[in-house]
Swiss-Prot record:
Protein name from the UniProt record: Non-structural protein 6
Localization per Swiss-Prot or TrEMBL: Host cytoplasm; Host mitochondrion
HAMAP family given in the database record: ROTA_NSP6 (MF_04093)
Entry GO CC: host cell mitochondrion
Broad class of the protein's primary localization: host cell
Organism: Rotavirus A (strain RVA/Human/United Kingdom/ST3/1975/G4P2A[6])
Protein family according to the UniProt entry: Belongs to the rotavirus A NSP6 family.
Oligomeric form and interacting partners: Interacts with NSP2 and NSP5.
Length: 92
């Protein structure tokens, strides 16, 4: 499986169970240290999906994926290396 397909599957798999997770979250449950990470992930995911119809997802899905990715990293005890690895892996 090539890297492009792996990234696509990764982004799609972030949507699994997204509705219950997304709607259970409190609006202010993500603290300030993760807000900039959300913006970074949103930008990287958009870069990954914007040029190819095969990768295009609607805005709500992108916001949900961004939030879930942020929460996933947040749950890894704010491990800087895990954060950098995730960002590098999602990056085009």
């Amino acid at each position: 499986m090539n890297r492009l397909l792996q990234r696509r599957l990764f982004l799609e798999n972030l949507l699994v169970g997204v509705n219950s997770t997304f709607h259970q979250m409190q609006k202010h449950s993500i603290n300030t240290c993760c807000r900039s990470l959300q913006r970074i992930l949103d930008h990287l995911i958009l870069l990954q999906t914007i040029h190819s119809p095969a990768f295009r997802l609607d805005r709500m899905q992108l916001r949900q994926m961004r939030t879930l990715a942020c929460l996933w990293i947040h749950r890894r005890n704010h491990d800087l290396q895990a954060t950098l690895d995730a960002i590098n892996w999602i990056s085009p």
